Amino acid sequence: MTTWITICDTCKRDGWDQGDMALTDGERLATLIEAEAEGAVKTRRVSCLMGCARGCNVAIQSEGKLAYTLGDFAPEQEAAEGIVGYAKLHAESATGQVPYREWPQAIKGHFITRHPPLPSGK
């Protein structure tokens, strides 16, 4: 199954309006994640994951596996590397669960929710 990183491209962190405002913080993080993920996992952008109080937000998902929402990321390379690194581990896991000791440091403390897979069949 394909693992996807869904990236909120409308996220704006506190102080966003103090910068050049050419791009949202979500757009900046999305660009970094997309470059880091190329050829490893799939990415897509959506407008609003409704986690505005904890932006920048991403979701890591795959059919039949646990799904995770992560947030409170700065739009920086270290965050993108950690998110993609975790998504690769998620892809390798049969259930989507990754042992804590394997988590990239950059994603620790950023988990918001975990969703069980949807039931299959009827």
Named regions from a protein language model:
Residues 30, 34, 81-88, 108-109:
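Generic detector of well-ordered alpha-helical segments enriched in charged/polar residues
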Residues 54, 59-65, 86-122:
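Short flanking/linker segments adjacent to small metal-binding domains or redox-active Cys/His motifs
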Residues 13-36, 55-76:
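Iron-sulfur (Fe-S) cluster-binding segments and ferredoxin-like electron-carrier domains
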